């Protein structure tokens, strides 16, 4: 895969709308510019080639807690059995604040290898060997953010109460 050039101004990129795309070149540029502006890595590397693996997913913290209390019971035969009551909290940070401990991924429905630009015209002598690009629409919309919240059980807090009886 080739490294992507992050355009700084409209003249840095040749915009060619895809077949059936009713947006003007200027409207496509505004979509591209807005996308670049919202992403910290792309924003600070305008006018440069992006480094390999330069853009990374946001870091996520997750803290899991376990509380356990043992209660000892003497049986009539003199044995000491144990009842353990426990409380497990997965993703405790998300319990404290709904924005903490949330995993993020590229927008759903898009390729894991995220591409916000699509080549619409291959380099040739007719276009001075300069490829044409567009920002593709999906279901009538363009992506507006690099990452979105990954809605799954791993991004939400969970609590479990347990009772265990142990024979000795």
List where the protein language model places each region.
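Short, solvent-exposed micro-motifs at the edges of structured domains
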Residues: 1-168
